[in-house]
């Protein structure tokens, strides 16, 4: 048995039609990037080997994979959704530090006016799937003979809009971001912004925004596919209730801010220690509140995490 791990974004951009699990048609509006294109080519080649050579294969197509649904653990600056979270988190920290310097308030306001922009179309929807759901799908595919020959979207039926991302980031990170046209941002605004920031002696912030444009830019544009789902439940036998995307993104913001400090904590041993402390703190909060940590409003979560965790030393209280 061969398990092919692809991406649900092999369907490319679509204006109206839904991306079906059973069909793979070269899109009229092309792809967000060459990663998606090469994955689509690989899927077509897999289909060919299945038909011609009798390859026993299950094709699993995860959407945009993010962290664990409970803890938000989503390491790495090069991940699609980490890009806006870490970029704006670092931007806010840099601007807060700048405000404490002479004439810093006016300088910070000027930088914020050009830096705190989010390259996304209001109509764009992202299909995020938690890593634990993907792992469940992979393990299930190994014990389901009926999955052979099937293409399975490991995706969600509750997508997140760019407006939701901005709202959650404001609540969790305290950043005020405005939407801007992604194509204009990538080709005109971003080069201008990075030049201004470098001249203003903010090279790290410029680098973070460059990563945002490079990694996330395409996924904020029009025509993002709406994925059909069903084979994950019907064929693989996964639970019908798929992860709550908004909850997962909220926990990702909290994790990136508190556990990894927007990517500044890089030592693997220290990260592993913090992950253990974080998981235990969440378990304590959930036991005391009787609710999922992800369901708590931002202000209540900040209060509760401060009661169980020393955020400076990152040790339990």
Stretches found by the model and what they are:
Residues 88, 138-142, 169, 251-256:
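Hydrophobic "lid"/C-terminal helical patch
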Residues 120-136, 151-172, 183-191:
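Substrate-binding strand-loop-helix patch
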Residues 1-37, 51-52, 57-58, 69-71:
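Conserved Rossmann-fold NAD(P)-dependent oxidoreductase catalytic core, especially the SDR/UDP-sugar
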Residues 223-317:
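Amphipathic terminal alpha-helices
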Residues 50-125, 131-136:
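NAD(P)-dependent short-chain dehydrogenase/reductase
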Residues 38-46, 84:
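Conserved catalytic Lys-bearing alpha helix of Rossmann-like short-chain dehydrogenase/reductases
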Residues 8-14, 66-71, 135, 158-163, ...:
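Flexible loop/turn segments at secondary-structure boundaries
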Residues 162-223, 242-245, 260-273:
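Terminal hydrophobic/aromatic helix or amphipathic segment near a protein terminus
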């Amino acid at each position: 048995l061969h398990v092919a791990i692809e991406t649900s974004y092999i369907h490319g951009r679509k204006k109206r039609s839904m991306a079906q699990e059973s069909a793979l048609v070269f899109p009229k509006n092309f792809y967000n990037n060459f990663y998606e294109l090469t994955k689509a080519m690989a899927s077509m080649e897999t289909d060919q080997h299945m038909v011609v050579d009798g390859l026993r294969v299950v094709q699993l197509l995860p959407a945009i994979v993010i962290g664990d649904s409970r803890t938000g653990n989503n390491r790495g600056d090069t991940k699609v959704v980490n890009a806006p979270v870490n970029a704006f988190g670092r931007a806010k920290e840099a601007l807060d530090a700048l405000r404490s310097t002479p004439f810093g308030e006016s300088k910070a306001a000027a930088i914020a006016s050009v830096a705190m922009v989010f390259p996304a179309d209001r109509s764009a929807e992202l299909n995020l799937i938690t890593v634990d759901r993907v792992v469940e799908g992979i393990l299930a595919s190994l014990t389901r003979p009926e999955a052979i020959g099937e293409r399975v979207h490991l995706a969600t039926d509750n997508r997140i809009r760019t407006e939701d991302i901005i709202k959650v980031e404001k609540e969790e990170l305290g950043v005020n971001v405005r939407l801007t046209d992604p194509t204009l941002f990538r080709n005109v605004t971003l080069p201008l912004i990075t030049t201004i920031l470098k001249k203003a002696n903010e090279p790290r912030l410029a680098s973070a925004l460059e990563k945002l444009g490079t990694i996330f830019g395409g996924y904020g544009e029009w025509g993002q596919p709406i994925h059909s789902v069903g084979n994950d439940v019907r064929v693989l036998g996964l639970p019908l209730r798929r992860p709550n995307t908004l909850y997962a993104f909220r926990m990702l913001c909290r994790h990136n801010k508190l556990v990894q400090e927007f990517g500044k904590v890089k030592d693997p041993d220290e990260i592993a220690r913090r992950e253990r402390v974080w998981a235990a703190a969440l378990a304590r909060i959930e036991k005391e509140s009787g609710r999922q940590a992800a369901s708590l409003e931002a202000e209540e979560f900040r209060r509760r995490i401060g009661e169980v965790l020393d955020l400076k030393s990152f040790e339990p209280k």
